[in-house]
Design a protein with these regions (language model features):
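Metalloprotease/metallohydrolase-associated module, dominated by Zn2+-dependent proteases
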Residues: 11-27, 32-65, 75-185, 202-302
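Membrane-proximal N-terminal segments immediately preceding the first transmembrane helix
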Residues: 69-71
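Active-site recognition of the HExxH zinc-binding catalytic motif
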Residues: 189-202
Length: 302
């Protein structure tokens, strides 16, 4: 069983970001104290008291200074992230980035709280199959043979969408309501978003980026003005090749030239080619299904 929380893709045209409340007062803590859901442990309550986690406020100047220092440390220390539009990233890079944020914004106590609650360190994963969410924070719960429930947390980042962005698409890239000028900035914003999910999961056991508490935490801690991303999706990437869902395309397969219709676009395009021997679909026709790399497809007119 698992609960997951993601940085969703913005499906609407880019517009002025929603105005979120940046509140240096203790209203968030007051909201938390009035909720029916208590903090998980005394240790976690001590953590939030120490860092003032539920009523944080960083000025724009503080946020800029801290994130600039983190960016410089990443470029200096990482074996992969040596340039802003990096071409390679590893889970060690994600762990390093999280650690820098944890120490800079939470005095290193967020990772400690994760370990104290689950007995396991926070895990990281790069996903080449996530096609809508820029990142995802997951709480896994497994029942052990002893009947105890083992929980652990994981932050996943959509590496494929990161690498498709800042290449050929000439448009603003907005993540969490902030315009990003390069791939590293986008990775920063994704990590910040997932950190807020992690904070809420650790303290409350649930998190929603559409909720008021999440939006105000993200605004106060990191200066976010939104909760979605506009990274390049596989569909937008495919459109650069003139390929969209419903497009008629041709391709070579085992020495034959086939013509079919694009039914879906993710990492590869799903192409349906009419064939009397194939299974029947809802339109009454028979098709064989092919999963094709975009570069092997070309538009066809029939």
């Amino acid at each position: 069983m698992e609960a997951s929380h993601a940085l969703p893709h913005c499906r609407k045209p880019i517009k002025e970001p929603e105005t979120l409340v940046r509140d240096p007062s203790c209203r968030l803590r007051q909201l938390a104290e009035n909720t029916s859901e208590p903090l998980w442990t005394t240790g976690l309550r001590a953590m939030t008291d120490s860092v003032d986690l539920l009523s944080p406020y960083n000025s724009p100047e503080d946020i800029a200074a801290k994130t600039t220092a983190i960016r410089q440390a990443v470029l200096r220390e990482s074996d992969n992230l040596k340039q802003p539009n990096f071409e390679c990233v590893s889970t060690e890079d994600l762990a390093r980035l999280f650690g820098l944020y944890d120490r800079t914004f939470f005095k290193g106590l967020l990772a400690q709280a994760v370990k104290a609650k689950t007995g396991q360190p926070l895990a990281f994963r790069l996903s080449s199959t996530m096609t809508r969410s820029g990142g995802k924070t997951i709480l896994y719960r497994r029942r052990m043979p002893s009947r105890k429930v083992q929980a652990n947390y994981e932050i996943a980042v959509a590496s494929r969408m990161l690498f498709m962005t800042f290449k050929q698409v000439d448009r603003p890239v907005v993540v969490c309501g902030l315009t990003c000028k390069d791939r590293l900035e986008a990775l920063h914003r994704i990590m910040e978003h997932e950190i807020i999910h992690l904070v809420e999961l650790v303290i409350y056991g649930k998190s929603s980026c559409s909720a008021r508490r999440f939006k105000e935490l993200a605004a106060n801690v990191f200066g976010h003005a939104g909760t979605t991303h506009a990274l390049v999706t596989p569909g937008e990437h495919a459109a650069q090749y003139g390929i969209r869902v419903g497009s008629t395309v041709c391709f070579e397969f085992e020495g034959r030239r086939l013509i079919g219709r694009v039914n879906r676009v993710n990492r590869r395009a799903t192409v349906l080619v009419e064939d009397a021997k194939g299974p029947r679909y809802s339109d009454g026709k028979n098709y064989h299904k092919f999963y094709m790399p975009l570069k092997r497809l070309s538009p066809a007119s029939v």
